[in-house]
């Protein structure tokens, strides 16, 4: 939270770390976890299931793993659970039928959990026209889309505005990461070829107001072992795309002058922050004048 993030996403609830008492999977700890997150100004917008909808695992195993995520989402009041299908051999129609069958089996569990299943734009569904056709076959309010900004744009060379045209009404949550084609590796945000500004513009065109979740695997850049620095870099990079809120300006009693902060109130800002704000509000005036 000190880094300025507003949410955290849970991935792989079957990791041993989640088997402990007091972990997010512990239903008896849910109330305390929600209280602690609220006090820190954080929320959990999404839980990521790890099941591959198109692999050779049985339908029962797939549904059980995702159902665990849905039950945990219900306990923690999480609105979304991500499901994914990566590339596997098979005819497209047969693959779509398999995914459709699994989602239809899971829908009653999701509805009971008051949670929405989000199919990620990854694997065969990085082709968002294909994903849209699948969603049209489902014709259900309980299924939305997790837009992985990287996959359609970089893997399928699909313009972001085309993704919006295909899926705009279904987008509930967003993942982002950057990629360096020269080295063929993922990299820190802003150091690769992902057109972040264009993607953010596409999100703004559909009035997206949800979270943008940064994906990072420490093995992608072993020399950047300090995750605090990685996330701080992401937060700093993304701050340029934030819309600054309109901030109140205070007038003096005669309305002959204006001040940025209320009179005789201690402000929690550093000197550089004060200087930046004064320069922003009064760009044509001297912010600080030193005399000798």
Task: Give the positions of each predicted feature.
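Histidine-acidic metal/acid-base catalytic patches
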Residues: 1-6, 31-34, 38, 77, ...
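Short, solvent-exposed loop/turn segments at secondary-structure boundaries
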Residues: 20-24, 56-61, 92-97, 156-158, ...
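Glycine-rich, proline-tolerant flexible connector loops at the mouths of alpha/beta enzymes
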Residues: 9-34, 86-91, 184
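Short, conserved active-site loops that position catalytic residues or coordinate cofactors/metal ions
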Residues: 3, 8-17, 45-50
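Active-site acidic/histidine proton-transfer and metal-coordination neighborhood
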Residues: 31-32, 36-46, 52-145, 154
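N-lobe entry segment of adenylate-forming
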Residues: 239, 246-292
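Conserved beta-strand positions in the central sheet of alpha/beta enzyme cores
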Residues: 9, 46-48, 82, 118, ...
